[in-house]
Curated annotation (Swiss-Prot):
Gene name of the record: gloB
Cofactor: binding comment: Binds 2 Zn(2+) ions per subunit.
Protein name, per record: Hydroxyacylglutathione hydrolase
Pathway: Secondary metabolite metabolism; methylglyoxal degradation; (R)-lactate from methylglyoxal: step 2/2
Subunit (UniProt): Monomer.
Length: 260
């Protein structure tokens, strides 16, 4: 599948974010401005290298949300071609992402592509999972955006491999405190499966049913369902709608055992 853009960019100095689907369901997000690119969670390197080189782009930085192999697997190979690129990752994951060059913690702010990026600690899927929030860029007239890895998915959330339901509940609530129009760039295309599960659980929910129809239509055309938005997740994501960590834990257990 070809990489797709989420912003029409007539001016090379305007930033845009592009999707590069790889493996079975991973999405590598590529944020570009001018001739510079920032790559988020490169599962593998070769498609990224080809995409950047074809467009004569230089890799400025890699953003890592967490340590899983399908998120960091391509980073070292990319660094062989762009040795000066920064690798941003959680300081608490230095033992598992030892090649990081910029170690960050919750609420840190860094500058990339002349934009401010805020780090958000969103543990749950893993103990040191982080997200990267890009506020509205007035120069680009873009909506805010968040690269959230495997914490928040389209109509879902990540499995609790290292964290607790309480961790995930707090992480999702934190993400949903971002502006409603914030675009959600998660790392896997799971939206349709998540909505099928949610619709089976709540067949009377019109918002979920309507989103499922829309997403299914997109997927049948070979299009992605992402990015989503915070407002969309607040309307149709059962994990986001959970009232407390106990309810989230019950939903997570049900989803883990569910078979379409």
């Amino acid at each position: 599948m070809e990489a797709t853009s989420t912003a029409a960019t007539s001016d090379k100095q305007r930033s845009s974010i592009h999707a590069l689907p790889v493996l079975q369901d991973n999405i590598i997000w590529i944020w570009i401005k001018g001739d510079q690119a920032v790559v988020v969670d490169p599962a593998i390197a070769e498609p990224v290298k080809t995409w950047l080189q074809t467009r004569k782009l230089s890799l400025a930085a890699v953003l890592q949300t967490h340590h899983h192999a399908d998120h960091i697997g391509g980073t070292l190979e990319l660094l062989r071609d762009w040795p000066n690129a920064a690798v941003v990752a959680a300081a608490d994951d230095r033992d598992r992402i030892p090649f990081q060059t910029i170690s960050v913690r919750d609420r840190d702010k860094i500058s990339l592509l002349n934009s401010s990026v805020e780090v958000l600690a969103v543990a749950g899927h893993t103990r040191a999972h982080i997200a990267y929030y890009l506020p509205t860029n007035k120069e680009d007239r873009e909506d805010p955006a968040v690269f959230c890895g495997d914490t928040l998915f389209g109509a879902g959330c990540g499995r609790l491999f290292e964290g607790t339901a309480e961790d995930m509940f707090k992480a999702l609530q934190r993400l949903c405190c971002l502006p409603a129009k914030t675009r959600v760039y998660c790392a896997h295309e799971y939206t349709e499966a998540n909505l099928r599960w949610a619709s089976a659980l709540h067949p009377e929910d019109i918002a979920i049913s309507e989103r499922l129809v829309d997403v299914s239509s997109r997927r049948q055309r070979g299009a992605l369902s992402l990015p989503s938005s915070i407002s969309e997740e607040q309307r149709t994501n059962l994990f986001v709608r959970a009232q407390n960590s106990k309810e989230l834990a019950e939903l997570r257990q049900h989803k883990d055992q569910w078979r379409n």
